[in-house]
Amino acid sequence: GCKKRKARKRPKCKKARKRPKCKRRKVAKKKC
């Protein structure tokens, strides 16, 4: 998921960026 710190530069992050929840909270941009 996009909330986890270990998610940086992982393929899961790329998927997380496309999720509406992540875009709304801007978590994917900061932590991925």
UniProtKB/Swiss-Prot annotation:
<keyword id="KW-0744">Spermatogenesis</keyword>
<comment type="function">
    <text>Protamines substitute for histones in the chromatin of sperm during the haploid phase of spermatogenesis. They compact sperm DNA into a highly condensed, stable and inactive complex.</text>
</comment>
<keyword id="KW-0544">Nucleosome core</keyword>
<dbReference type="GO" id="GO:0030261">
    <property type="term" value="P:chromosome condensation"/>
</dbReference>
<keyword id="KW-0221">Differentiation</keyword>
<dbReference type="GO" id="GO:0030154">
    <property type="term" value="P:cell differentiation"/>
</dbReference>
<keyword id="KW-0238">DNA-binding</keyword>
<keyword id="KW-0539">Nucleus</keyword>
<protein>
    <recommendedName>
        <fullName>Protamine S4</fullName>
    </recommendedName>
</protein>
<keyword id="KW-0158">Chromosome</keyword>
<feature type="region of interest" description="Disordered">
    <location>
        <begin position="1"/>
        <end position="32"/>
    </location>
</feature>
<keyword id="KW-0226">DNA condensation</keyword>
<dbReference type="GO" id="GO:0000786">
    <property type="term" value="C:nucleosome"/>
</dbReference>
<keyword id="KW-0217">Developmental protein</keyword>
<dbReference type="GO" id="GO:0007283">
    <property type="term" value="P:spermatogenesis"/>
</dbReference>
<dbReference type="GO" id="GO:0005634">
    <property type="term" value="C:nucleus"/>
</dbReference>
<dbReference type="GO" id="GO:0003677">
    <property type="term" value="F:DNA binding"/>
</dbReference>
